[in-house]
UniProtKB/Swiss-Prot annotation:
F-type ATPases have 2 components, CF(1) - the catalytic core - and CF(0) - the membrane proton channel. CF(1) has five subunits: alpha(3), beta(3), gamma(1), delta(1), epsilon(1). CF(0) has three main subunits: a, b and c. Gene3D superfamilies: 3.40.1380.10, ATP synthase, gamma subunit, helix hairpin domain. Pfam families: ATP-synt (PF00231). This is ATP synthase gamma chain. GO terms for cellular component: plasma membrane; proton-transporting ATP synthase complex. Produces ATP from ADP in the presence of a proton gradient across the membrane. The gamma chain is believed to be important in regulating ATPase activity and the flow of protons through the CF(0) complex. Belongs to the ATPase gamma chain family. It comes from Rickettsia canadensis (strain McKiel). Its main location: membrane. GO terms for biological process: proton motive force-driven plasma membrane ATP synthesis.
Amino acid sequence: MSNLKQLRTRIKSVKSTQKITKAMQLVSASKMTKIKSQIANSNFYIEAISKMMSAILAIDMYELSIEGQKFFNTVPNKVNLLIVMTSQRGLCGTFNYNIIKQVKNDIKDLENKGKQIKLIIIGKKGYEALKRQYANYIDSYFELSKIHDEKLILQVKQKIMSAAYNLEVSNCVIYFNKFKNAMTQIMTRQQILPVEKSKDDSTVKKYHYEYEGETLISNLISLYVNSQINYALLQNRASEEGARMTAMENATNNANDLISKLVLKLNRSRQAIITKELIEIIAGSEAV
């Protein structure tokens, strides 16, 4: 009987866990849908800014601006700024592992070349994975649970802009997971600085600039950096929720399979007990 009690307790426990994983799956699905909508709404703006930057590069307009040269030209022998986007919470499969693995590989390559490195880490999981080995490289760390997206984007942008203005960085790269679908997230390494020239110069014909110089370049650079961070953040959030939804769906299905096996085992144990009791009753009646 104690065995039956243990089985019933375990079944109850697994069912309770299954309810939690199912609820988390539904919450992540809802969040993912909302973020996908935000991505769709922001894509036009981000693409427009990127095309304008490519147009400026194509006609060498940035050479008219001292500020522009800081953002479009490589500054040799300065810091390599790596911005690492991870999640604040776990239970999302290999979502963070792929990012951390790539960052560690790139840091190793930069160290072998004798390059200077600085890290801006977004998300608790990335910080926990990198702080022990690369604490001396960490410039800033942002907890996603303690800061709004707008403020996060602004602060990261200010750090990038300040470093570029002061000629402190050779390049700036951002790591994030690009959303494809709920089951597929693509680890992405995207260069922010220096701004790369587009292979397609056809966009140049679409723009007519009313004025030139510092004001245009400065405003456009600020918008560009802001849009790149916003894009990476939205993609990473959608990927995180997709990964978590898939992980929780798998956990829910595994719990269902385990419950079926435990119920079968419970029924067999009950059947064995009943059969034993019947045999004892029959044996007792025959003895009388």
